[in-house]
Amino acid sequence: MSFLSAEEKNLVSGLWGKVNVDEVGGEALGRLLVVYPWTQRFFQSFGDLSSADAIMSNAKVKAHGKKVLNSFSDGLKNIDDLKGAFAKLSELHCDKLHVDPENFRLLGNVLVCVLAHHFGHEFNPQVQAAFQKVVAGVASALAHRYH
């Protein structure tokens, strides 16, 4: 049984098809690093993260944000099996990178804010509610290896 209704799946896929993954990915990761500065410790090799401007213009942040959102896109293709879709990434982030799984929830919430900013009125309460479910599901799937 899916955690999303058919209508919610349509809302998510309809909006996601319009997302510029390159732009939104970099912005979401950048905002995470600005708003939650302790997350920067995982990205020390990215160079200058000394200010919000430095983070938001950092090419490595943008590139990794794109990579993150491409993985998110791949997961959306398997929306009814997020744990399976994100199993390898969960293992990587748990066993090798030792990322606090709370960071997945934080990034999901930042992503929702970035989508709202980019899509304005199109990101209505129904779309937001559907995306909140999706990012919670993805965060749970990424944290699965930790349990």
UniProtKB/Swiss-Prot annotation:
Listed GO CC annotations: blood microparticle; haptoglobin-hemoglobin complex; hemoglobin complex
Chain positions found as N-acetylserine: 2
InterPro entries registered for this protein in UniProt: Globin, Globin-like_sf, Globin/Proto, Hemoglobin_b, Hemoglobin_oxygen_transport
Keywords: Acetylation, Heme, Iron, Metal-binding, Oxygen transport, Phosphoprotein, S-nitrosylation, Transport
Keyword Transport: yes
Modified-residue entries (N6-acetyllysine), positions: 60, 83
Domain Globin residues, every copy: 3-147
SUPFAM superfamilies tied to this protein: Globin-like (SSF46458)
Modification sites for S-nitrosocysteine: 94
CDD domains: Hb-beta-like
Keyword Transport applies: yes
Tissue specificity remark: Red blood cells.
Pfam families recorded: Globin
Gene3D superfamilies: Globins
Function: Involved in oxygen transport from the lung to the various peripheral tissues.
Subunit structure as annotated in this protein's UniProt entry: Heterotetramer of two alpha chains and two beta chains.
Record family assignment: Belongs to the globin family.
The name this protein goes by in its record: Hemoglobin subunit beta
Source species: Panthera pardus orientalis
